[in-house]
Amino acid sequence: EQLRKDFNDAMTNENAVFPQLSNEVAEDEAVVKITTNKGDITVKLFPKYAPLAVENFLTHAKDGYYNGLLFHRVINNFMIQTGDPKGDGTGGESIWKGKDTSKDSGAGFENEYSPYLYNLRGALAMANSGPNTNGSQFYINQNKEDWSSKLPTERFPAKIIEAYKNGGNPTLDGGNYTVFGQVIDGLVVVDKIAE
């Protein structure tokens, strides 16, 4: 019921806030710097809309879990993916695995969907192998293609359609992947990694 209300608000309220559309960091957001050998990527995270994904990401980051990991899946004009300690896309687990079965049954934690977050260019989202299988892997949307003319106005808010002019992957929207952050500086680094 709340999701339906939020969707209606996102679609009809011209004052609806889409946090990805601003580089300003709100009080209820977190900022993280991802350091790579190509440069730094600064992201803001959205715990209000994706509390599990943000807590998992921040805890792993603070614990050094992500240190030295490769971007093991790199597809130019699509996305770059990391977070797997095995480096091949088959590894990684959530901070709750084996500790809290109410959050991670053993297969990963649940998807979090918000009609205020989308797979826009620069969006961070959890990579998974199906519903509710989120572990430690995440991707950054890198696609530069303008999708705005291809998006149905009954499914995407006008401000988001406008934002998709800059690229992203709207085919990943709809709740299958938890969007939990947005690059606010260093998108050029994301492009360097993708190339």
Regions found by a protein language model. Name each.
Residues 1-195:
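Cyclophilin-like peptidyl-prolyl cis-trans isomerases
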